[in-house]
Amino acid sequence: MSCFVGDFFGRAPQARARMRRGLLFAGYLLAALLLSHWFFHSGVLSKVDTLFHLNRVMGIAAGLAAGDFPVYLHGYQMQGFGTADGVLYPDLLLYVPALLVVCGVPLAAAYHAYWVLVVFLGLAAAWRGYTLLTGRAFVGLLAALLFSSSYFLLFCLGTSVGAYVAISFLPYAFGALYALLRQPRGTRAWPELVLAFTVIAESHVINTLFFLLAAPFCVFAWRRGLADRVRRRGLWRAALFSLLVNGWRLAAFAFFYARVDFHIRHPFFASLAIMTSDAGNLFAAQFWWGWPLCLLAAAAVLARAFRRRRLFLLTLAFCVFLTSLIWSGFPWRTVEQLPWVGHVLGMFQFSMRLLPLGLLPLALFLARYLAVFCRTAARRLGAGCAGRAAALLLALGAVAYGLQAAAQTAFTMGGVDIRWQVAYEQVTELPSFGPRVQPDYLYADVEPEALFASGEVPAPGEVRAVAGEAAVSSFAKRGTRLSFAYVSPAGAEVQVPLFFYPGYQAWVDGAPLAVAEGAHHVLTLSLPAGAHEVSVRYTGPWFFRASALVSLASLMVFFFLWACEWRRAHA
């Protein structure tokens, strides 16, 4: 033990460096445990979209259990008829809880394990991103903690399985882009940019669009690095591999979105002006910043000396503008009447989704201010070594306060009372449709509750003859795969309990069988006479499989090049 202590403290510079690293890791670990403590519970955290996200997990699990990968269609939702959520909702990290469910882990435990995982990953990604932006791990951690303490991000915690991950990885993506273009040793940062973008693109569509819209402005602002040929090559590599690695989802998304009219293309809120709040309710929602960020911003404005003060004030003004978009007095209806603008804005659904684009750089400036303020105050008190610890404790306090505030949600938006307290529910039987299970990527003209109640479609496990006669036996279904045997004296046209989507294939005794779209978009088969066995599965159009192979090959090449970059950097 004495040898260990002597080795640890024998050299003051090494000892201080180890203590700093230990302090940073302890701060990260404590913050991650604070942010994830809601999920160390036997029940399922009860939030508005919980049942919907559990359905997504079960849809992926059903596909994996059937041997499908990727799982394009979720065969659990809508009484097993299936939805296109797997194509149009990015859900890469949801494969983790789905795989746990397949392995026998209870659904509630698997879902909470997902949230614990993404909290730790998201905070680490934000820390890494801010470190790349500042070149200092300590300021990077402070910025990550302040960003994670924002009321908006904590509102998403437990509510939006994709948005929380994507927003947490935005600092990483922008940090990797900055390092690639501006940092002295950042020429090898392009693989990190690909990694960060892939997580964003495979988690949330809207935040992917936000990054793609903001990235050109960042490249222009940091354009000095484009003069370096190595940096230009790295930027092109990042763009190319980001496209190739995620091409499998892009191809499927574009195909379906262009051909199928889904519920989500007809938003419930016709205008962004609907989901807004008056000044009093904005105050109750802490302006979606959280009081710690508001107080730090006010203190930074009043500070006499502040590095890059003009840029900070511009960032603050931008945040205030984005916050005003959530105010009921903002003229959204007038803005939406502008040519092309209204159609594009409708995709965002809620104006508050824009706010992280302002909070992200604001957290960086506030972290710098907090670090300088605590260091200066500690020196004046004769305790210079306590400055870092004080700043870290204040940032952790902001996270703790934000969690406490988010656990007592109470404000009004769009005339709707939004109230929530930490509560859990026991999901013994998971409904596959109905309240809290949104039919976002179901045909827009299908209302599942009314349709299933009408009896106009087959019941689960039923093969219904709509023309001719067929005696069915040995029916089996898992995910979007089903099989059955039948006997028909003269052939029959039957409906099976699946919604039709382009890409279904069927076989009768191993020979291809034509599939068609019947009434209410139900998959219909024309069966030949005799005794036969039928199997149905979703494979997707041929270019789905081709794009998946290209993405897989690109991923392997990407990791090989990343390994080469890493070896050169550590040679």
PLM regions: where:
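Membrane-embedded transmembrane-helix bundle of lipid-linked glycan/lipid transferases
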Residues: S2-G415, A531-R537, F544-A571
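Extracytoplasmic
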Residues: A124, G397-R481, P489, Q495, ...
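A generic structural signal for solvent-exposed, polar alpha-helical segments
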Residues: M78, F210, A254-R259, L293-A297, ...
